[in-house]
Amino acid sequence: MEDELRCPTCKQLYANPVLLPCFHALCLGCALDIQTPYSPGSALPGAVNGAGAASAAGHNGLHGNGGGAGGGAAAPVTNPNGPGTRHSSHSSAASTASSNTGSESVTSDQDQSDKVSIFSEADSGVVCCSNTSRPVSYAGTGLLPGVGNVVAPPGAAYCLTCPLCRKLVFFDDGGVRNLPTYRAMEAIVDRFCAREALRCQMCETDPKVASLICEQCEIRYCDACRELTHPARGPLAKHTLVKPRGAAQQRESVCGEHEETLSQYCLSCKAPACGLCIGELRHQAHDVQSINVTCKAQKTELSHNLQQLSEKARSTTEFIQRLKGMSDKVTESCMEFERLVHAQCEALIQAIHDRREYLLEAIRMDKDTKIRILKDQQSNCTGKLQQTTGLIQFCIEALKETDSAAFLQVGSMLINRVTNTDMTWHQEVTNAAPRVSPIVDLTLDDAALARAIDNLNFIQMRAVKDGDERCPAAPMTPTILPSDCSAENNSVTVAWQPPNHSFVEGYVLELDDGSGGEFREVYCGKETICTVDGLHFNSMYNARVKAFNSAGEGEYSELIGLQTAEVAWFTFDPVLSGGAGSGLIFSKNNATVSVEGWEHRVALGSVGFSRGVHYWEFTIDNYTADTDPAFGVARIDVARNKMLGKDEKSFAMYIDRQRSWFQHNSIHERRVEGGITTGSTIGVLLDLERHTLSFLVNEMPQGSVAFRDLYGVFYPAVSINRGVTLTMHTAMDAPKMDYF
């Protein structure tokens, strides 16, 4: 509470507090210090120019409840620039030194931020009288110089700016001494100071209650010590002795004008009054109540409001205590979590140690196996060598035999043994290689584990109550990696980075329609990179991604725009064209096609179009037979064993050496002169903005628009048979047609 009892200017406990019209308080001395003389044309302290509404002062008498001083009544204030009016009042009790001259104060809200106006439309003009028996009236309409359209009260001699709300108050010659004494604040300060047990500072033992304090010496005295140590003579005679705070006597509120007890309260003027005041003209027809009844009602209302505020304060106190308890719990929880992380890391380290022992044991076992195999092979080779050496030595000894009959007895056998040994030696010994490599042909794949260690991190858990099962929170937002995203032809690749501190079960990638329309899901899975094919050409696609887990879905990432190619690049698609059994022969990276049989076969391009303008050409590489190749577009389910245009799924132009026809659903029409030979070019222009199909032969239009009202997805198509070879050229700009 002590902060409420300190002056905003001197920061000390209030001394002789006075009440401003804005209901803020100041020490009387501080108010005297900060009030400034005012004269028309002078600058206002803290005021800025503006265009705010003006406030005109009213007039009336206000009866104060101060010690012997009169007051003035709150007057209604009319805003000349608007319809709003308001009554403002406050208790008035001037000091004994107050003059008999009335004063008028005008308050204004000062807005330092936008510098629009220093006066609010709700501000009021107040007439304050010191000790007068007549109402004081100021009816001036002059503008306050330098403050826009604010009406300056005539006769203003002083002004003061409230240090708290920056409202401006004007006074007459009496200045701030016309302000009422803030008796409630004064009493509260006295009671607050009385708690400090103000004792005499000069008593040697058992200090008595101080009765006076010297303002110059700043020492408290009881009556006995004052007579002994601070006599009122000599230099001490000029010192001022006052009662210490807390020693104020209870004073009865009396009317400053009639010296009568204030027993009534005017609800219209919102001011206390005595019995004589009620009988005067200014309170005629006003609603009047007993001052005790009004005081009791306001105390009851204040008590009720205080009870509600006390409940909130109690709740806030409990909340603060809970926060303090949570601080302790945070420390305890963090210590427990540190122990858990330490234990988990130790478990991981132990798992790595166990795995290391397993891997080392596997290496030792592999070593033992290889050594055993090599020893077995060495033993086998040694045995073979010993047998061969024994045979050689035996043969040498046999060659020493001089008895021909004896040698011939075994000669054939030895020749066969040596020959067989020599033949098998090449297989068993000469070409024999070590059965195992002396080099360990293994390597430790630790890249995945290293990445896992690098990615080892915390995941955010969902906040739960004590005792509830903890589970991961919904994941945070993934981050799209622009450097890893790309667009090629009619496909886009989007890559993203997993969110930090989140448990993710999967991702959802969404694309719009390439025209800023609604998003649709194109991928759902655990990968962090995705390529989407089959998009429109020359379109800007916006992509976004979000993560999800069992707890819910996270927020979408920021958008990334990817532009597909302006013109289409494609080839023939052997699979869409019927596969290996179609009889079509593709070459030059599927750009050239031919066929062996006499039956027409349809070849389709690798992309389908549903939007945009697209153009491609065919070059006739070989045209030796009397046949009619057909060029155009088809749907994906076109009949592949008929000439293009024979069914309702295809739109084509078939042409020979002299002329051409347009054909759809076996209906051919509009013959156009002009055919093809080897080296001719056929151009196909598919305009899905106008939904038309046109053809060109040798870069010249072949008739007018061939087909109209084409909607859906169409694939480039051609049908040929034996004797025709052609090559398709794509990624070409569409020619300008002048017959549209």
UniProtKB/Swiss-Prot annotation:
Residues 64-114 are annotated as: Disordered. Residues 64-73 have a biased composition (Gly residues). Keywords: Cell projection, Coiled coil, Metal-binding, Neurogenesis, Repeat, Transferase, Ubl conjugation pathway, Zinc, Zinc-finger. Pathway: Protein modification; protein ubiquitination. A zinc finger (B box-type) spans 195-244, 250-291. GO terms for biological process: axon guidance; axon midline choice point recognition; axonogenesis; compound eye development; negative regulation of glycolytic process; netrin-activated signaling pathway; peripheral nervous system neuron axonogenesis; proteasome-mediated ubiquitin-dependent protein catabolic process. Disulfide bonds: none annotated. Residues 399-459 form the COS domain. Zn(2+) 1 binds at C200, C203, C225, H230. Disruption phenotype: Defective axonal patterning of terminal processes in class IV nociceptive sensory neurons (C4da), including defective contralateral projections in ddaC and vdaB neurons, during larval development. Defective larval locomotion behavior. Defective targeting of R8 photoreceptor growth cones to the medulla layer during eye development. GO terms for cellular component: axonal growth cone; neuron projection; perikaryon. Pfam families: fn3, SPRY, zf-B_box. GO terms for molecular function: ubiquitin protein ligase activity; zinc ion binding. Residues 294-324 form a coiled coil. A zinc finger (RING-type) spans 7-30. Its EC number is 2.3.2.27. E3 ubiquitin-protein ligase activity. During embryonic and larval development, regulates the pattern of axonal projections of class IV nociceptive sensory neurons (C4da) downstream of netrin receptor fra. Regulates fine-scale topography of C4da axon terminals upon neuronal activity. During eye development, consolidates the attachment of R8 photoreceptor growth cones to the target medulla layer, probably downstream of fra. This is E3 ubiquitin-protein ligase TRIM9. The gene is Trim9.
